Structure formats: structure tokens, C-alpha cells
């Protein structure tokens, strides 16, 4: 049975990859399972300059998920390409670099730098992180800013360009179409929902940054609907993400319209979940006598023309 999928110019051996920010740079997981078995390796967000991130506490468990306010803590581009990239370039054949900037110029700088490295096969633009006061949420919810970022990076970057969208908007299909028209090769849907938790004893917000991004199974129904809606709105591949913790959860995303999927919070719960999921998806195709995982994409839309 065929698990291969195509994202932009890339052919992935299977549709399963980690969500940026939940898998580090892969180094913490390489002794748990062979990362070459993944469809791709998506690393945590890199910015031009080092970021210390938000003040702690940064992570808190909630019902059916978690809320985090990491604040894009990372060592910056120079350290990444000099110290980290040499360590991870052979972990998987398809390395996807997630980048964020505090200005259009910073996105352009990172795209120009990434273009120089053959090891980096694709970029995923983080225009949707809800934890940072500059960039992130502002870009992801400002339609004109989104268009400007994607189009400016597209002019510089010739390899596969993926845009990760925020769900914290009124109609995500408008942003999906804007990203496609600006030059995106694929979309990642979705990032986290903005949320807050309060300690009733201290009567203060628990997170150091007060608010953060909610992820995990609690957001899956909303994520599936957004993939479903965007599948009808755009013609480029969608990478579905949001609360995938089982084979059935993954299948929901494919049926809604996803070509590939990312696993986030579940990596903390079960570090070996992704290789198990890949195996179970293959078994599912065999049991259902489906020749290719690509055949599942968008099947939930069948018959809509008659509704």
C-alpha cells in the first residue's frame, strides 16, 4: 500500500511529520526511533536573532490538551546553521525549516539564507504563533501583512513554501486563499487557539505571559472543520494539525481534505507515537483495500454538489 504524498515539489515517503515546536530539532528523539521513517522533519521555529522566550511558567496541562507560551525561544539563525544544522541534516531526507520574523525584512533575510542550504528542502512560515507581542499573531490576522510576507518570501525562495495559518480569525478561508494567491505551495492548518488559565487561589494568570496557545485533542473538531472549509477554497495541498492522538484522528484530517498531517502535543504524551501511526495507517489501507493514502484526501466532501 502506498503512503507517499506530494507537497509542492516534495514527495514524502509517508504523510506523517512532527509539528514545529513539539519536537525540538529532532535530537531529543533520534535515540527513540529512526527519524528517517518520518515523512519529513519539521524543526522548531528559528528567528534571525536569538530569543529567550517568555517568562515562566510556560506550559500548563488543561483538559484534553495543554496551553503553552514558549515565546519562540530559539538560538537564532547563525547558531542554528553553524551548530545545529550539521547535527540534524542527515536525520531525514526532507528537512522543513519553520521560520518567524518581527518584520517582512526578517522573513526575507531568513528565506534568503535558507535558500543557500541544500539540506533545507522547504520553508514553513510561522505567521500565526499567538505567543509573541511582535510578529506572529499580528501578521497572521492582518490580511495585507500576510500577503506581503508570503509574496516577498516567494520572490526570494524557489523551493517548496508552506504557510502555517492561525485559527484566531473570523474566516480562515480568506487567509488561505490570500496565501495561495501570494505564492504558497501548501498550507499548514492550524496553529494553536489563544487561551488563558487562571489560578483561583492566587487569582492570577498561571502562565508568565498571561495567555498562550491551546493545543491537543480539545481543538481537533475545530481544526478538522478549518481543513474541511479550506479544502473547498484552495487548490494547494493542506497539512492538517491539531489534536492528532490516534489513527482515527489522523483519518479525520485526510477525509476533511488534508494531504499530510503533523503531530504536536501527542509527542509529549507518547514519544514513539508517530512511527506507530505510520504503521497503523499502512495497515488501515491494507484492511480497507485502498491502494494509496492520497485516495482518502477530501473523501468527506463526496456528494456535496447534490446538497
Curated annotation (Swiss-Prot):
Keyword Transport applies: no
Subcellular location, record wording: Cytoplasm
SUPFAM superfamilies for this protein: FMN-linked oxidoreductases (SSF51395)
Matching Pfam families: DHO_dh (PF01180)
Endpoints of the signal sequence: none
Catalytic activity, as annotated: (S)-dihydroorotate + NAD(+) = orotate + NADH + H(+)
Keywords assigned: Cytoplasm, Flavoprotein, FMN, NAD, Oxidoreductase, Pyrimidine biosynthesis
EC number, as in UniProt: 1.3.1.14
GO MF annotations, alphabetized: dihydroorotate dehydrogenase (NAD+) activity
InterPro entries: Aldolase_TIM, DHO_dehydrogenase, DHOD_1B, Dihydroorotate_DH_1, Dihydroorotate_DH_1_2, Dihydroorotate_DH_cat, Dihydroorotate_DH_CS, Dihydroorotate_DH_I
Protein name: Dihydroorotate dehydrogenase B (NAD(+)), catalytic subunit
One example of a Gene Ontology biological process annotation: 'de novo' pyrimidine nucleobase biosynthetic process
Entry binding sites for FMN: 20, 44-45, 98, 126, 164, 190, 216, 242-243, 264-265
Matches recorded under HAMAP family: DHO_dh_type1
Disulfide partners: none
Record-level GO cellular component terms: cytoplasm
Cofactor dependency: FMN
Gene name linked to the record: pyrD
UniProt record similarity statement: Belongs to the dihydroorotate dehydrogenase family. Type 1 subfamily.
Active site annotation, chain numbering: 129
Subunit composition and interactions: Heterotetramer of 2 PyrK and 2 PyrD type B subunits.
Recorded metabolic or biological pathway in which this protein acts: Pyrimidine metabolism; UMP biosynthesis via de novo pathway; orotate from (S)-dihydroorotate (NAD(+) route): step 1/1
Amino acid at each position: 500500500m502506498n503512503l507517499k504524498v506530494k507537497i509542492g515539489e516534495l514527495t514524502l515517503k509517508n504523510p506523517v511529520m512532527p509539528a514545529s515546536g513539539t519536537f525540538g530539532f529532532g535530537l531529543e528523539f533520534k535515540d527513540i526511533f529512526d527519524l528517517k521513517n518520518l515523512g519529513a522533519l519539521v524543526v522548531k521555529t528559528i528567528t534571525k536573532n536569538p530569543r529567550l522566550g517568555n517568562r515562566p511558567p510556560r506550559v500548563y496541562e488543561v483538559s484534553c490538551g495543554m496551553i503553552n507560551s514558549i515565546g519562540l525561544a530559539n538560538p537564532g539563525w547563525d547558531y542554528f546553521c553553524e551548530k545545529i544544522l550539521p547535527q540534524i541534516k542527515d536525520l531525514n531526507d526532507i528537512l522543513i525549516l519553520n521560520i518567524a520574523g518581527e518584520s517582512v525584512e526578517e522573513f526575507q533575510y531568513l528565506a534568503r539564507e535558507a535558500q543557500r542550504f541544500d539540506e533545507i528542502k522547504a520553508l514553513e512560515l510561522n505567521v500565526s504563533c499567538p505567543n509573541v507581542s511582535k510578529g506572529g499573531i499580528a501578521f497572521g490576522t492582518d490580511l495585507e501583512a500576510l500577503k506581503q510576507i508570503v509574496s516577498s518570501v516567494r520572490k526570494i525562495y524557489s523551493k517548496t513554501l508552506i504557510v502555517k495559518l492561525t485559527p484566531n480569525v473570523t474566516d480562515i478561508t480568506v487567509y488561505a486563499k490570500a496565501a495561495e494567491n501570494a505564492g504558497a505551495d501548501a498550507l499548514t492548518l492550524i496553529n494553536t487557539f489563544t487561551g488563558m488559565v487562571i489560578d483561583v487561589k492566587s487569582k492570577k494568570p498561571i502562565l508568565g505571559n498571561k495567555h498562550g496557545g491551546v493545543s491537543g485533542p480539545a481543538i481537533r473538531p475545530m481544526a478538522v472543520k478549518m481543513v474541511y472549509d479550506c479544502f473547498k477554497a484552495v487548490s494547494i495541498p493542506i497539512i492538517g494539525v491539531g489534536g492528532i492522538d490516534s489513527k482515527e484522528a489522523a483519518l479525520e484530517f485526510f477525509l476533511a481534505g488534508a494531504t499530510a498531517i503533523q503531530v504536536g502535543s501527542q509527542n509529549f504524551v507518547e514519544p514513539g507515537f508517530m512511527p506507530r501511526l505510520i504503521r497503523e495507517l499502512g495497515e488501515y489501507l491494507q484492511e480497507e483495500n485502498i491502494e494509496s493514502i492520497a485516495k482518502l484526501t477530501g473523501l468527506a466532501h463526496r456528494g456535496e454538489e447534490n446538497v
